[in-house]
From Swiss-Prot:
<dbReference type="GO" id="GO:0070181">
    <property type="term" value="F:small ribosomal subunit rRNA binding"/>
</dbReference>
<feature type="compositionally biased region" description="Acidic residues">
    <location>
        <begin position="21"/>
        <end position="33"/>
    </location>
</feature>
<keyword id="KW-0687">Ribonucleoprotein</keyword>
<feature type="compositionally biased region" description="Basic and acidic residues">
    <location>
        <begin position="34"/>
        <end position="45"/>
    </location>
</feature>
<dbReference type="Pfam" id="PF08069">
    <property type="entry name" value="Ribosomal_S13_N"/>
</dbReference>
<keyword id="KW-0689">Ribosomal protein</keyword>
<comment type="subunit">
    <text>Part of the 30S ribosomal subunit.</text>
</comment>
<feature type="region of interest" description="Disordered">
    <location>
        <begin position="1"/>
        <end position="66"/>
    </location>
</feature>
<dbReference type="GO" id="GO:0003735">
    <property type="term" value="F:structural constituent of ribosome"/>
</dbReference>
<feature type="compositionally biased region" description="Basic residues">
    <location>
        <begin position="1"/>
        <end position="10"/>
    </location>
</feature>
<dbReference type="GO" id="GO:0022627">
    <property type="term" value="C:cytosolic small ribosomal subunit"/>
</dbReference>
<comment type="similarity">
    <text>Belongs to the universal ribosomal protein uS15 family.</text>
</comment>
<dbReference type="InterPro" id="IPR012606">
    <property type="entry name" value="Ribosomal_uS15_N"/>
</dbReference>
<protein>
    <recommendedName>
        <fullName>Small ribosomal subunit protein uS15</fullName>
    </recommendedName>
</protein>
<dbReference type="InterPro" id="IPR023029">
    <property type="entry name" value="Ribosomal_uS15_arc_euk"/>
</dbReference>
<dbReference type="InterPro" id="IPR009068">
    <property type="entry name" value="uS15_NS1_RNA-bd_sf"/>
</dbReference>
<dbReference type="InterPro" id="IPR000589">
    <property type="entry name" value="Ribosomal_uS15"/>
</dbReference>
Length: 155
């Protein structure tokens, strides 16, 4: 499948091994994993960072290779169940942060045409994602602009 804003195709990579149950060496209790997920979310970590921390550091010293295999729920589902989910979806927030950084860079460096184009592409992705999340995770009246993005990021 081609990429969104280029004519090139994506690079292929290896797939995650298919597994129906967690490995024997990772025998952590589901409740302990959920507690650790909520604890990390309260510390301000994003769902992807929580997954990385559980993979690297683990719970009680035992790594958790896959939260969904161990608990039957995704990290975001655990956060929703404990009312600890972030206000905005992680992918949307990351795009807003990128757009704010690019906008400030383009303001300071007006001749940087490559990053002007990158800003346009990022804004296009934000508008597409806003259409997807509008009504569910975003307000119905949400419209992207640099000012609204900066306000959201500064919160």
């Amino acid at each position: 499948m081609a990429r969104m804003h280029t004519r090139r195709r994506g690079s292929s990579g290896s797939d995650r091994p298919t597994a129906d149950e967690p490995p024997e060496w990772s025998d952590v209790d589901e409740d302990a994993i959920e507690e650790r997920v909520v604890e990390l979310a309260e510390q301000g970590h994003d769902p992807s960072q929580i997954g990385l921390k559980l993979r690297d550091e683990g719970v009680q010293g035992t790594p958790v290779p896959d939260v969904k295999l161990a608990t039957g729920k995704k990290v975001t589902e655990i956060l929703e169940a404990h009312d600890a989910e972030p206000e905005l979806p992680e992918d949307f927030r990351n795009l807003l942060e990128k757009a704010v950084r690019l906008h400030e860079h383009v303001e300071a460096n007006g001749q940087d045409h490559q990053n002007k184009r990158a800003l346009q592409n990022t804004q296009s992705k934000i508008r597409r994602l806003a259409d997807y999340y509008r009504g569910d995770k975003l307000d119905e009246e949400f419209a992207y602009s640099y000012e609204t993005a900066r306000e959201i990021i500064e919160e």
